[in-house]
Amino acid sequence: MVKRSSHRQVVLDEDDEENYNNNLDDEKMEVLLIPQSNSTTFASSDATQMYKKSRISSNSENKKQIPDTKTLLETFQKIKKTLECPICTEALQRPFTTHCGHTYCYECLLNWLKESKSCPTCRQKLYTQPSPAYLVYEIMNVVAASNSGFPLVGINENPAKKQKEVLFDGMFKQEDSHYPRSILVDSEDGVLRCARCQWELENPYHCDHCGFQISDDQDSGREWFWDGENAESDSSLNGDNTRGGNISTNRAFNNMGHAPITAVPQDWLRFDEGEEFVGSDLESDFSGPGEYDVDDGFIDNRATSQLSPVESDDDFVAPVNGSNGNGITALDSTDSEEIDIMNGFDEERDSGGTNMVSRSETCYNDGQRYDELRRELADIQNESLDSLNSSSNNSPSHNNIHSRQHPFSSDEDEGNIVTNGTGLRSSQSSSQNRGFDLEPYSEVFTASYPRRQARRTRTIQLDSDEES
């Protein structure tokens, strides 16, 4: 029986390979490579050859991964090129990094900023003071220690020793004091924003857009865009009810001396919080449906009784409502407005209303024409009777429900016709046929409405009992 350790030692001696220590890992790998039988374990020649080939290939791969001296020199030259200043193209002296990530010599960057306050590489405007590049400083020390040809001028000057001096002639110190060192929170979506550029913050201590450094002191709280929203909540949490504003806003005033650029007037409140807006006691310009301004001069606010009556067109020929035994059709008024006016006159006369008095005074002035109008109406009725009698002699007269009137005009004595009021003739004829006495209302029917020229008409009734 061949032992595993001795078998492995023999294999290594034949191949002139280095000796390996006997450990558990090697024994496990050898067990996997050497097949075993049920009774005894023997080393197989095929398994031994496979094991030797795997060892040789792994050693050759490890030798290829080790870089040569030429490759190391090329890599070192690239690192030295990276550590050069983009302005003077020399090794960095007191390296300082801007908020956009570019590194320059302090003296080179200072001279550049005096001419243009922007990054020399990307031309981004610089809001904050560049910071010392400590990591670049350590890398330069490592490179200088490994290569004697690397310049060491100014490297030994630690930039941390220059922190107390006024850097960059104080051109960034005054500008930084105008902004609060706390975080601004957008009240609409709750997004953290930078106090200088209002850019959305991913890092709560640094703005990636403008490089603004945000203080992490305990006294520095979060500022809200709208200072009137959280005044009550902040006051209750801090136990300060004596001050009348948002505590965070007051802190911003104390830090800067004036309101931040994101502060808004006190009356700029949100529309969904239900606050009482400034000027809410004034009359609203947005009225609901059916509402109107009572002070509007274009709207007539008088009562109905104070309005003038509406004039209606007068149809002189009235429709046929019936006939007498002689075959003469009685003239009757069907104008409901005139009947309502007469009923209204009765009520006003009985109640002693003031409107009746004013109308009577107006009608009194036109009372002199009433006699002439009544005589004219009588003449027209007589002419109508004559025409009807003559027509009845020529053709048989029959009365039925289908009787109708056929008006026609006559130019005879047209110049003697006088003007009359609205509905006067139809009301006069209707009252006479009904036996109604119009003498007490003589002044009423002669109202002072605009009169129009009337034309004389005649009524002829053509009826037949049987159709031939």
UniProtKB/Swiss-Prot annotation:
<keyword id="KW-0863">Zinc-finger</keyword>
<dbReference type="Pfam" id="PF13923">
    <property type="entry name" value="zf-C3HC4_2"/>
</dbReference>
<dbReference type="GO" id="GO:0043161">
    <property type="term" value="P:proteasome-mediated ubiquitin-dependent protein catabolic process"/>
</dbReference>
<dbReference type="GO" id="GO:0008270">
    <property type="term" value="F:zinc ion binding"/>
</dbReference>
<dbReference type="InterPro" id="IPR001841">
    <property type="entry name" value="Znf_RING"/>
</dbReference>
<feature type="compositionally biased region" description="Low complexity">
    <location>
        <begin position="386"/>
        <end position="402"/>
    </location>
</feature>
<feature type="compositionally biased region" description="Polar residues">
    <location>
        <begin position="417"/>
        <end position="434"/>
    </location>
</feature>
<dbReference type="GO" id="GO:0061630">
    <property type="term" value="F:ubiquitin protein ligase activity"/>
</dbReference>
<keyword id="KW-0539">Nucleus</keyword>
<feature type="region of interest" description="Disordered">
    <location>
        <begin position="386"/>
        <end position="468"/>
    </location>
</feature>
<keyword id="KW-0479">Metal-binding</keyword>
<keyword id="KW-0862">Zinc</keyword>
<feature type="region of interest" description="Disordered">
    <location>
        <begin position="1"/>
        <end position="22"/>
    </location>
</feature>
<protein>
    <recommendedName>
        <fullName>Uncharacterized RING finger protein C548.05c</fullName>
    </recommendedName>
</protein>
<dbReference type="GO" id="GO:0035861">
    <property type="term" value="C:site of double-strand break"/>
</dbReference>
<dbReference type="InterPro" id="IPR013083">
    <property type="entry name" value="Znf_RING/FYVE/PHD"/>
</dbReference>
<feature type="zinc finger region" description="RING-type">
    <location>
        <begin position="85"/>
        <end position="123"/>
    </location>
</feature>
<dbReference type="GO" id="GO:0044732">
    <property type="term" value="C:mitotic spindle pole body"/>
</dbReference>
<dbReference type="InterPro" id="IPR017907">
    <property type="entry name" value="Znf_RING_CS"/>
</dbReference>
<dbReference type="GO" id="GO:0005634">
    <property type="term" value="C:nucleus"/>
</dbReference>
